[in-house]
Amino acid sequence: DPTQPAAPVVESDQAAEVASLDNALNNPDFTSVFAPIDPQASRKKMAKQAGVEPVILMEHVTKIYPAQPNKPALDDINIEIYPGEFVFLVGHSGSGKTTLLSTLNRDVKPTSGRILVAGQDLMKIKNRKVPFLRRQIGAVFQDFKLLPQKTAYENVAFALQCIGKPKGVIRSQVPEVLRLVGLADQMDSLPDQLSGGEQQRVAVARAMVNRPPLLICDEPTGNLDPAISLGIMKLLERINRTGTTVIVATHDREMVDSMHRRVIALEGGHVIRDQERGGYGNYGTN
């Protein structure tokens, strides 16, 4: 059950872990392995000029939970995100970040509005088609969501087994993606034998092994030390440079301010700011 509690986190040798992350980030094979979208379409302006359709289109999206009928979790959201963009989603807890991300893979169905993801209308898609939609979306979470009784290799392989990939493809792609995130020597380790940063790298590998064009991350560095958080974010940035669209919900002010990427700020279910090369803004960490 992928929703089981996260495995215990072992203490890490931070210097060694940072070094292994650096080695992964300097791997020249990233571009050859992860290239689902033309990197030239990596900026919103260029994509629009080229007539490229958004990979995510949200029009007048509202979500009202029955328990809070007078307080929409999302209220008239209008967003376009283009292939190859890297977007931060910021705001207080309860501002709507997680609900917004959950609508993108149909974990949550909006009350009203329209959502297109990779050209598919999520308000009209049949339930039996949802698993096919999710194959185009990688997901990374704060608590890793690794299967505790499976090794790093088995956790990543499981993502391919679930969509019926042949054994030969699994034997080829899983070691490759683990090598690319700097875990070639940890393939046989169980989650409780890995540090938090290593567990998150397994989660990133699992999310990317099917080479989806879209990666959504909900607080991916929330439980990690600053140095390891920086490495994970650089890993996501490296994946983004190959063309993958990356959306990251985070409370990490310093990270957002240092990376100068597009920032969408939510408050009370509303988009209150959508800024190219933006900063975190005046939001607390609660």
Q: Where are the language model's segments positioned?
A:
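Short coil-to-helix segment of the ABC ATPase nucleotide-binding domain corresponding to the Q-loop/switch region
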Residues: 150-158
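Helix-to-loop junction immediately C-terminal to a conserved catalytic motif
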Residues: 105
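Conserved ABC ATPase signature
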Residues: 190-194, 198-200
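Conserved signature/switch motifs of ABC ATPase nucleotide-binding domains
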Residues: 189-192, 210, 242
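Catalytic Walker B motif of ABC-type/P-loop ATPase nucleotide-binding domains
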Residues: 215-218
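ABC ATPase NBD coupling module
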Residues: 122-138, 241, 283
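Conserved ABC transporter NBD signature motif
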Residues: 113-121
